[in-house]
Amino acid sequence: YEAALSAAGCFIRMYPLQKEKGFLLQDDFCDDLTDDLDLVFLCNPNNPTGLTIPQELLLKILDNCRERNIYLVLDECFIEFLPEPEKVTMQGKLDEYPNLLILRAFTKIYAMPGLRLGYLLCSDEDLLDRISRSMQSWNVSIPAQMAGLAALNEDAYVKEARELIGKERAWMKAELEKAGLTVWDSCANYLFFEGPKGLAARLEKGGILIRDCSNYPGLADGYYRAAVR
């Protein structure tokens, strides 16, 4: 999002999450919602931590955004990995908050990232029309469309994937903690942890790839994200 906004010439204000606060979004986020803002991006669950934002805080943020005519873009691309995503998603608030935009993806839960298939939810039809008119004419490939239609019939797969990833995530977290690493309680298909500096480069030599998170705002060398497979 930072790259896209920068390319459009937007002024960007960051809100780095803090280790001493568990890398959780805090109530003081609302203090940063000033009248000079047009758009706010939040990721729920967060990437790279996998932590979710409490609904009470999200509603408070939504109210503040609505009062100041700020659009809130909520990235829920990893929400399907939660045991009960319907209890966390803000999809039920779309009619109440026309300033709410929700991003969802097929590519995460259905494990087909190369096809690049996702969608936007919003109750502001005029805004959706303006967004549609600014997009490329052929923005979704036919293979992606066919894969998306097929994926909609895979309810059993989604259920099995959630259960398997939940089980493997708990095992992987326990094993990383046994190795002396600090691991946060992710709800997604990855784990965020703190370890020795240079760990990603050393593991790569052994054929193991993890995400070095040192280029995330507020993070330094020694923070990593590992996929749960």
Could you tell me what each predicted segment is?
Residues 1-10, 138:
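Substrate-binding/gating loop at the entrance of the active-site cleft, primarily
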Residues 14-16, 39-46, 72-76, 184-186:
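Short beta-strands and strand-loop turn motifs
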Residues 19, 165-166, 170, 174-207:
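Conserved PLP-binding catalytic core of the aspartate aminotransferase-like
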